[in-house]
Regions:
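Conserved phosphate-binding elements of NTP-dependent enzyme cores
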Residues: 1-930
């Protein structure tokens, strides 16, 4: 195969890859698929990306390299034809509190440029356009009057350099000026000087120097004369010039012009792009320094339940015997100010909220209450109370816009930059489509608008039209931040690169998958090679080339079981992917759904975009919450349902999302657990066997061996986390890290224990011929076989759940940091399965199918059934239709994302939801249930 058409990998041995060789076609859309743990990421990220990135970094100088991540060479014979690689992962990339969707997609940078170039400044006093005038504007003013209209050209008289008015007039007269206008009356300068000598200088007088007297005419001579006079007037009047027109009926009209950027007596800043940057001291609000929030009294802590009225005790700090005096006083004063004391807080107008918070001076209001607390801070109870209500609160100066107030005076199309970043992206697109500009502005903004419109379209294409540009990057989900990175990559339109994406379909509803495929195609059509690690059937079918790694996971994977396109699929393959794609293996929905009578109901949920909905979560069944991206699934399940119940069952300090009440059979459940995909442990010492508490039993077993007893070794002696039996050279890690300045850190096997983590005498203690190190090297499947054979039922019982959730291929001592997100979540699931929890518990999962192959999903559903059979309840946020069709109860939110979402569209069995015409989930379920 010719080098230019393929990226050739020969003998890849990273992690569990078994010396594989593969040719990836360049300039195509390639999907790498396979079971969870089969080696997809090892091939795509640890081999392809690592090498593409390393070669690019190697081409830089050693000075530049020290600022970049140092990269080691992947274990591989050779890789040919690899372009520079860019990885777009699921990680929420930005922890920076200043980073927003607008800044990370670069749309905000272009908006700043747009406002700096064509923004119009309006005076906050009169609303008039602030403009710098030139002589042309003055000529234009004359041309609008009928020919023959008399007018004068005037300049305001400013005594300069500390002179008196009389001295200034004297100098002007010597320079050849003859007349002034005083209080609309024209006088000769010498007459006015005599008047001043007689009466003394007035404190304030409107005195203008008369520069010229003319009649309006459109001929060239008049225009030239007026231009000269106007320039003289502006020079004499310190940038200001007036024209006074006299009409036939004796009335006059005065027009003011200025070369300064001012109006209504205020001098404005001329727009620059720095003026709109909240990361620059020039543009950032001085109070919050561009964060938009300050530490102050947090509205959400003072009024946690916005569904209550003031009368019902919405203001928490006014509860209790002593503080309720404030409430009584407020209720007494309220009728006089037309304040509705029985209206729920969320229904109050802004004016009414302002009265409650800021009130009239010296009256009972929330501000004056906290002022009293601050004045009495020397008493500890007041200090404690103040601390309880302090939190991040919107900056009172900029109201969360992050910019100085001057930036708000500049508008494009009648809107300020702060108003634009608050619009959802689909509304922003409509704004720019309808933006009317004059010829000059349109020419200036043409290129900028192209860039903005393209990037907005890319965000729409990846299904993120519901986000706003000022949404903080660190508040996005993994799938959202990955798709933002994808849109940014499209925006930067690089060519000839290798893009490697990790499951871009995460968090995407089936409705948006087509659009995602289109985006991936666009990226490929620019001339890039796009490699996607993916399990989504539609994306696999849309690929130009499929690489399937397997046949199973871990040690039983790491081989290429299929490579080619969709047309060449052969029945009877040993590839699970091929068998699912050909319909030889399927996930069969249950014959009947479990009936239910008991439930917990969330009433009036209105956190974020939820529209005050009532939702029932049935108990002891599997409920799946669906809906398009941004429809409010995570808000409902995690922020409202989970946090509110957690508060019921334990002293949880986290504030639940806004809702009226929780009703139903709350007491039938004893606890609620949220199982996410975060790593089970960040350290290299944490591993699955310690997480499911099986290692404790294994250590006890070794401590009971005759040699251990003889030498006095306790169970703690067999731990690699505490001093004793572990190798002290590497502190039980098995490896030693040597720091190198310009190259990747070298991780070397420990010379003392040769990677075995324990001292030699510890390893002499054996059980059935196996040392503790040998046990840690076994996979879960091997260990279960070994311990079953030797009648160690306690250990087997702890390990069995790992096998049940499909992690039989993982080594007992494998570091958690090498596990994928899907694997982490399943280790947690195994932990819950291993606990003999008899108390009924609700388990909440957020997209548990992330990183899971069709075959793994089957096992996951079996694990869920096992939990339900023990009396537990499962609630899942999920898009995967194979999981949705197996649910007992489906809750569909929508119909769209963002502001157009947050409603309960349908609820019932999958078959009932499939009948719902307005539900997108229903439309796709219908196909799946056929």
């Amino acid at each position: 195969m010719s080098d230019s058409k393929y990226i050739s990998i020969k003998g890849a041995k990273v992690n569990n890859l078994k010396n594989i060789s593969v040719d990836i076609p360049r300039g195509k859309l390639v999907v790498v698929t396979g079971l969870s743990g089969s080696g997809k990421s090892s091939l795509a990220f640890d081999t392809l990306y690592a090498e593409g990135q390393r070669r690019y970094v190697e081409s830089l100088s050693s000075y530049a390299r020290q600022f970049l991540g140092r990269m080691s060479k992947p274990e591989c014979d050779f890789i040919k034809g690899i372009p520079p690689a860019i990885a777009i992962e699921q990680k929420v990339s930005s922890r920076n509190p200043r980073s927003t969707v607008g800044t990370s997609t670069e749309i905000y940078e272009y908006l700043r440029l747009l406002f700096a170039r064509i923004g119009k400044t309006y005076s906050p006093v009169s609303g008039q356009l602030v403009k710098k005038h030139s002589a042309e504007d003055i000529v234009q003013c004359m041309l609008e009057f009928p020919q023959g209209t008399r007018f004068t050209v005037l300049a305001p008289l400013f005594p300069r350099e500390g002179r008196s008015l009389m001295e200034q007039l004297d100098i002007d007269m010597k320079q050849g000026f003859a007349r002034v206008e005083v209080n609309r009356e024209i006088m000769r300068i010498e007459d006015y000087l005599m008047q001043l000598q007689a009466e003394g200088e007035p404190k304030k007088a409107n005195v203008y120097l008369l520069i010229d007297r003319m009649t309006a005419d459109h001929d060239q001579a008049s225009i030239s004369r007026l231009t000269d006079s106007a320039e003289t007037a502006m020079y004499e009047g310190d940038g200001a010039c007036m024209l006074r027109f006299y009409s036939a009926d004796g009335s006059t009209q005065l027009f003011s012009f200025s070369t300064k950027f001012e109006a209504d007596g205020i001098t404005f800043e001329e727009p620059t792009d720095q003026m709109f940057s909240f990361n620059s001291p020039i543009g950032a609000c001085p109070t919050c320094e561009g964060f938009g929030k300050i530490i102050g009294i947090d509205e959400q802590l003072v009024i946690p339940n916005r569904a209550l009225s003031v009368y019902e005790g919405a203001v928490v700090c006014w509860r209790g015997e002593k503080m309720s005096e404030w409430l009584k006083e407020f209720l007494h004063e309220a009728p006089a100010h037309n304040f509705p004391i029985f209206t729920p807080y969320y229904e109050l107008t802004q004016e009414q909220k302002d009265y409650l918070w800021h009130g009239p001076r010296e009256k009972a209001c929330i501000d004056s209450f906290f002022k009293m607390l601050e004045e009495n801070q020397y008493k500890i109870q007041y200090r404690v109370m103040l601390a309880r209500y302090r939190g991040k609160t919107t900056c009172p100066t900029c109201h969360g816009t992050r910019l100085k107030k001057e930036a708000g005076y500049v508008k494009v199309g009648g809107r300020s930059i702060s108003e634009l970043v608050d619009l959802p992206i689909h509304d922003l697109q409509v704004f720019f489509q309808n933006l009317q500009l004059d010829d000059h502005d349109a020419a200036v903004a043409k290129r900028i608008l192209t860039e903005i419109n393209n990037r907005i379209q890319f965000l729409q294409d990846v299904g993120l039209g519901y986000l706003t540009l000022n949404r903080l990057s660190n508040s996005l989900s993994g799938g959202e931040s990955q798709r933002i990175n994808l849109a940014t990559s499209l925006g930067s339109s690089l060519v000839g690169s290798l893009y490697i994406l990790d499951e871009p379909s995460i968090g995407l509803h089936s409705r948006d998958t087509d659009r995602l495929i289109k985006v991936l195609r666009q990226l490929q059509q620019l001339g890039n090679t796009v490699v996607v690690v993916e399990h989504d059937e539609e994306i696999i079918r849309a690929a130009d080339y499929i690489i399937d790694i397997g046949p199973n996971a871990g040690r039983l994977g790491g081989e290429i079981v299929y490579q080619g396109d969709m047309k060449d699929l052969q029945p009877g393959s040993n590839s699970h992917t091929v068998r699912y794609l050909l319909g030889e293996e399927i996930i069969v929905p249950p014959l009947a759904h479990r009936p239910w009578n008991n439930y917990i109901e969330v009433k009036g949920a209105r956190e974020n975009n939820l529209k005050g909905i009532n939702v029932r979560f049935p108990l002891n069944v599997m409920t799946v919450v669906t809906g398009v991206s941004g429809s409010g699934k995570s808000t409902l399940v995690r922020d409202v349902f989970y946090k509110a119940l957690k508060r019921e069952y334990s002293e949880s300090s986290e504030r639940p999302g806004e809702h009226l009440s929780l009703e139903g059979d709350i007491r039938m459940v004893k606890d609620i657990e949220f199982v996410d995909q975060n790593p089970i442990g960040k350290s290299s010492r944490s591993n699955p066997v310690t997480y499911v508490k099986a290692y404790d039993e294994i250590r006890k077993l070794y401590a009971e061996q005759p040699l251990a007893k003889q030498l006095g070794y306790t169970a703690g002696y067999f731990s690699f986390n505490t001093e004793g039996g572990r190798c002290e050279e590497c502190k039980g890690e098995g490896t030693v890290t040597v720091e190198m300045q310009f190259m990747a850190d070298l991780v070397l096997e420990c010379e003392s224990c040769h990677g075995k983590r324990f001292k030699a005498d510890t390893l002499e203690v054996k059980f059935q011929g196996q040392s503790i190190y040998d046990i840690l090297e076994m996979t879960v499947n091997q260990a279960i076989e070994f311990f079953t054979e030797h009648k160690q039922s306690k250990i087997v019982k702890r390990l069995r759940p790992l096998q049940e959730v499909g992690l039989g291929y993982v080594k007992l001592g494998q570091s958690s940091s090498t596990l994928s997100g899907g694997e982490n979540q399943r280790v947690k699931l195994a932990y819950f399965l291993s606990q003999e929890k008899t108390d009924p518990t609700i388990f909440v999962f957020d997209e548990p199918t992330t990183g899971l192959h069709f075959h793994d999903i089957k096992k996951l559903l079996e694990a869920f059934d096992s939990l339900i059979s023990r009396g537990h309840t499962i609630v899942i946020i999920e898009h995967n239709l194979d999981v949705v069709k197996c649910a007992d109860h489906v809750i569909d939110l929508g119909p769209e994302g963002g502001e157009r979402g947050g409603n309960l569209v349908a609820a019932g069995t999958p078959e009932e939801v499939a009948q719902c015409e307005v539900s997108y989930t229903g439309q796709f379920l219908k196909e799946k249930l056929k």
